[in-house]
């Protein structure tokens, strides 16, 4: 889960990372109030989860309250790379002597953590990495040892920060590591980390990505969810504990087990090449349980996707036998009633498959077609989706 800048700074403050004073608002009047409270020049910053805000006119210096109001009026509602600005961070403007870069992230390739640091901050780090790779230090972090002050200082040294700020930078870097570990983050980035004329170190910007798999032990993170920006279908799936990702195709997919669902996406995409280029509409894994309630929840999500023209239910019976899956499908269709209005192609295999197929045959639902193999089912689902386009 990506956080807005103001949310990242809330976590920074929680762990003692120094930042500029400020508050978030969603109105021009609120921007005026905050600017008046601060009583100094402020920065008015668009709160969107995308880079390049400054170039798009989403970050503006405001020397006085009137300027802050004018800038708030200009930024609210601004479209930045498809993200409409609905919130502003109004923060005290800081005098800047130098700008640095620091981040902690999960290094999946090497199965460890990675710190990155550079004396060249304030610009897109991808540009620095490409044009001057030697300016970006990459330091592996031992997951057991972590980052103490001494190691934090070595990170700052590797990034070639000036000697006179190494100690102050080390303190901030160590606290950023605490944010990374204690908040179960996948990324903590500060760009720029600034040095003020009196040698203070401040995190003027912040980017944090939280690991949603750790939500069970981070109850406070629920408050960071941006429900307005979340796809309503994904929100409905989450409320029903379904693993769902919306795609841009026409064939809805339901399967049990991530591996089977991924394989189903592949065969549907392949079959779609022969049927007008139709593609999978989603990833939906119902897990080990295929009860009527679970199946109804899954179908409810998929059938409410206007792009979906057909549904492919692909289940391998294991602990949950195929007859239970079949009863789940029949029960789900009864529960949904008229909402179930798109053709379903069902492929069952595994434990008690013959009984499962018998149950579906006896139900004789007009929308359900039972197919024996995955390839045939994918082809049929793609054909039906193409015909309905």
Curated annotation (Swiss-Prot):
Residues annotated as binding substrate: 256, 318-320
Chain sites annotated for binding Mg(2+): 191, 205
UniProt keyword Phosphoprotein present: no
Cofactor remark: Binds 1 Mg(2+) ion per subunit.
Residue ranges occupied by any ATP-grasp domain in the UniProt entry: 9-236
Pathways involved: Carbohydrate metabolism; tricarboxylic acid cycle; succinate from succinyl-CoA (ligase route): step 1/1
InterPro entries found in the cross-reference section: ATP-grasp, ATP-grasp_succ-CoA_synth-type, ATP_grasp_subdomain_1, Succ-CoA_synthase_bsu_CS, SUCC_ACL_C, Succ_CoA_ligase-like_bsu, Succinyl-CoA_synth-like
Enzyme class, first EC level, given as a word: ligase
UniProt keyword terms in alphabetical order: ATP-binding, Ligase, Magnesium, Metal-binding, Nucleotide-binding, Tricarboxylic acid cycle
Catalytic reactions of this protein: succinate + ATP + CoA = succinyl-CoA + ADP + phosphate; GTP + succinate + CoA = succinyl-CoA + GDP + phosphate
Sequence positions that bind ATP: 45, 52-54, 94, 99
EC number from the UniProt entry: 6.2.1.5
Superkingdom classification of source: Bacteria
GO biological process per UniProt: succinyl-CoA metabolic process; tricarboxylic acid cycle
GO MF annotations, alphabetized: ATP binding; magnesium ion binding; succinate-CoA ligase (ADP-forming) activity; succinate-CoA ligase (GDP-forming) activity
Similarity remark: Belongs to the succinate/malate CoA ligase beta subunit family.
Protein task: Succinyl-CoA synthetase functions in the citric acid cycle (TCA), coupling the hydrolysis of succinyl-CoA to the synthesis of either ATP or GTP and thus represents the only step of substrate-level phosphorylation in the TCA. The beta subunit provides nucleotide specificity of the enzyme and binds the substrate succinate, while the binding sites for coenzyme A and phosphate are found in the alpha subunit.
PANTHER family per record: SUCCINATE--COA LIGASE [GDP-FORMING] SUBUNIT BETA, MITOCHONDRIAL, SUCCINYL-COA SYNTHETASE BETA CHAIN
Subunit relationships: Heterotetramer of two alpha and two beta subunits.
Protein name as it appears in the record: Succinate--CoA ligase [ADP-forming] subunit beta
Organism phylogeny: Bacteria, Bacillati, Actinomycetota, Actinomycetes, Mycobacteriales
């Amino acid at each position: 889960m990506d956080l807005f800048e103001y949310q990242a700074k809330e976590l920074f403050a929680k762990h003692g990372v120094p930042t500029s004073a400020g508050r978030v608002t969603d109105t021009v009047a609120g921007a005026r109030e905050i600017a008046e409270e601060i009583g100094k020049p402020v920065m008015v910053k668009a709160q969107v989860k995308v880079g390049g805000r400054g170039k798009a006119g989403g970050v503006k210096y405001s020397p006085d309250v009137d300027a802050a109001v004018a800038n708030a009026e200009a930024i609210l509602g601004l479209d930045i790379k498809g993200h409409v600005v609905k919130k502003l961070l109004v923060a005290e403007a800081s005098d800047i002597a130098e700008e640095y870069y620091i981040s902690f992230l999960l290094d999946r390739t090497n199965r460890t953590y990675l710190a990155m640091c550079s004396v060249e901050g304030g610009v897109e780090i991808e540009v620095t990495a490409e044009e001057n790779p030697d300016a970006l230090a990459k330091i592996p972090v031992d997951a057991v040892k972590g980052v103490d002050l001494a190691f934090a200082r070595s990170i700052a040294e590797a990034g070639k920060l000036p000697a006179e700020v190494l100690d102050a930078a080390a303190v901030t870097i160590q606290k950023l590591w605490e944010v990374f570990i204690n908040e179960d983050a996948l990324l903590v980035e500060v760009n720029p980390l600034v040095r003020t004329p009196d040698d203070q170190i401040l995190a003027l910007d912040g980017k944090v990505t939280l690991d949603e798999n750790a939500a069970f032990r981070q109850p406070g993170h629920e408050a960071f969810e941006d429900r307005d920006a979340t796809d309503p279908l994904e929100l409905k799936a989450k409320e029903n504990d379904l693993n769902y990702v919306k795609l841009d195709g026409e064939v809805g997919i339901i399967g049990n087990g991530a591996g089977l669902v991924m394989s189903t996406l592949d065969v549907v995409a392949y079959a779609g090449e022969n049927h007008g280029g139709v593609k999978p509409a989603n990833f939906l894994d119902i897990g080990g349980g295929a009860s009527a309630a679970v199946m109804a929840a899954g179908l409810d999500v998929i059938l409410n996707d206007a792009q979906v023209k057909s549904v492919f239910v692909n289940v391998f019976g294991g602990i949950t036998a195929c007859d239970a899956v079949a009863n789940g499908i029949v029960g789900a269709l009864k529960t949904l009633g008229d909402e179930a209005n798109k053709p379903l192609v069902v492929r069952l295999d595994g434990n008690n498959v013959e009984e499962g197929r018998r149950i579906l045959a006896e139900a004789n639902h007009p929308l359900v077609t039972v197919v024996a193999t995955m390839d045939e089912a994918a082809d049929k689902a793609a054909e039906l989706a193409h015909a309905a386009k």
